[in-house]
Amino acid sequence: MHIGGGVVKIRILILLMLALFLLGCSSNVNTNVKLKVFHAGSLTEPMKAFKRAFEEKHPNVEVQTEAAGSAATIRKVTELGRKADVIATADYTLIQKMMYPEFANWTIMFAKNQIVLAYRNDSRYADEINSQNWYEILKRPDVRFGFSNPNDDPCGYRSLMAIQLAELYYNDPTIFDELVAKNSNLRFSEDNGSYVLRMPSSERIEINKSKIMIRSMEMELIHLVESGELDYFFIYKSVAKQHGFNFVELPVEIDLSSPDYAELYSKVKVVLANGKEVTGKPIVYGITIPKNAENRELAVEFVKLVISEEGQEILRELGQEPLVPPRADTAVPSLKAMVEVS
């Protein structure tokens, strides 16, 4: 009996050890992997939807999203040394200019947008403003408007580009001067048929705060308009729709939306404080996986979701046009079946 009891105890001990081992394995399987996605502020709502869809497919993954202006988003990796698994920006060329070749080596272009002028129902002169008189409304002394910081956010330099292009479209050389130059130290200069604005460093930007407000990211202007501190702000159409704003659709010649006007858009350039020159072009968003991504396989799956038909439908539902088919600037073996290489 004594020997038999010992055998039973040994078997029980073995079973307990096996159970603990299996429990440990199970625990490891269920431990959340954190997939870090740094993205442009204007992608905040789409990223919430991508996060939900991805986590449903990958229950052991927690997608951590973090919004900022696109240039600021990239600087988190290139200057601050932070780790991200996916980077998504509102201007695909920023990835190429700021991350190649050290931090990334490919970009997929996946979505489009356009610049609009958004406002509340009770913004000053909301009942008068339209696509032909908007700049006259903004000139009025009791009207305040805003845009994001061009050094941090593509929406900022695109807003300034749109205002400068308005001078050409409306044949009025005073529009930018009256709206921006008169109220800040931001000025375009003409150079061989092109118009160039050289940005001071962010801490040296000077503005008349009774007329203009600037924030690092376009999304930070939303509450200023909602609270009545601002009457109007330049923003992407998708963001205006997502947040229920009224908006003036600017003429296609100045809203940076159409490839048909790429040559016209290219007449305006902004040199950022870091020395990078940005040329006016149709708005196209970009996505990449940094070279030092810690969860590369999952990052590839996340990018696949964004550029898939499901991802394209998510964008459409949120008022943003996907680029169909998505285009890559170089062959990406793990994604080649889903993109065109241009």
Curated annotation (Swiss-Prot):
Q: Which GO terms describe its cellular component?
A: plasma membrane
Name the source's superkingdom: Archaea
The UniProt entry lists the main location of this chain as membrane
Q: Which residues bind tungstate?
A: 41-42, 70, 153-155, 218, 236
Residues at which molybdate binds: 41-42, 70, 153-155, 218, 236
The Gene Ontology biological process annotation of the record reads: molybdate ion transport
What is the recorded membrane topology of this protein? Peripheral membrane protein
Q: Which GO terms describe its molecular function?
A: metal ion binding; molybdate ion binding; tungstate binding
Task: Report the protein name in the record.
Answer: Molybdate/tungstate-binding protein WtpA
UniProt lists the gene as wtpA
